[in-house]
């Protein structure tokens, strides 16, 4: 699998707290990593519609978390957008 336990721990340690994996920044970073991986997969496999649907669902989940973070703490929202280079 492309996302190992070590890679998840690394992502959570960089963007949030290694112990608190439910933190919005960590979840957004994890979704961003998965989205970039699926995007690369879809460039090679254009007719993989199941993966395309999964990508759309992940983008929606990330968008919902970003909206939540924007509503709760605008400074954390702006920081995660800048760090992950998510266009807005």
Swiss-Prot record:
Its assembly, as annotated, is:
Part of the 30S ribosomal subunit. Forms a bridge to the 50S subunit in the 70S ribosome, contacting the 23S rRNA.
What PANTHER family does the record point to? RIBOSOMAL PROTEIN S15, BACTERIAL AND ORGANELLAR, SMALL RIBOSOMAL SUBUNIT PROTEIN US15M
Q: Sum up the protein's function in the record's words.
A: One of the primary rRNA binding proteins, it binds directly to 16S rRNA where it helps nucleate assembly of the platform of the 30S subunit by binding and bridging several RNA helices of the 16S rRNA. Forms an intersubunit bridge (bridge B4) with the 23S rRNA of the 50S subunit in the ribosome.
Upper lineage is: Bacteria, Pseudomonadati, Bacteroidota, Flavobacteriia, Flavobacteriales
Which Gene Ontology cellular component terms are annotated?
Answer: cytosolic small ribosomal subunit
Q: Which family does it belong to?
A: Belongs to the universal ribosomal protein uS15 family.
Q: Name one Pfam family in it.
A: Ribosomal_S15
Which gene holds the coding sequence for this protein? rpsO
- List the GO molecular function terms: rRNA binding; structural constituent of ribosome
- Supply the alphabetized keyword list: Ribonucleoprotein, Ribosomal protein, RNA-binding, rRNA-binding
This protein's name: Small ribosomal subunit protein uS15
Report the superkingdom from the record.
Bacteria
- Which biological process terms from the Gene Ontology are attached to this UniProt entry? translation
Report the NCBIfam families cross-referenced here: S15_bact
